[in-house]
Amino acid sequence: MSRPKKCRHLSSCVPCSLFKPNGIPSSELEKIQLEADEFEALNLGDVQKLSQLDAAASMGISRQTFGYLLASARRKVATAVTQGQALLLPLNVKKD
């Protein structure tokens, strides 16, 4: 049995709910779901350029968990971009 998820502190606003290739209806595309905590990890690690330790502390999780989230988010974004898939973004992320 896996451990229950820890409560994570999220503070990013998502500007839209879907990124997709131009000119292709979303109904014809495979979709990849980016979770709220993965979105936050991308924002803190790649946009705000925080260290993994600082970003993990900001989210209230361990540095190792932050690293897993960041790697998962990067993999999903890279897959969507390189394979022409739609990337679904979380709508429930709100600023604290």
Curated annotation (Swiss-Prot):
Coiled-coil intervals: none
Superkingdom assignment: Bacteria
Disulfide bonds: none
InterPro entries: UPF0251, WH-like_DNA-bd_sf
Xref: Pfam families: DUF134 (PF02001)
Family recorded in the similarity comment: Belongs to the UPF0251 family.
PANTHER family: PTHR37478, UPF0251 PROTEIN TK0562 (PTHR37478:SF2)
Protein known as: UPF0251 protein Shal_3723
Protein's organism: Shewanella halifaxensis (strain HAW-EB4)
Organism lineage: Bacteria, Pseudomonadati, Pseudomonadota, Gammaproteobacteria, Alteromonadales
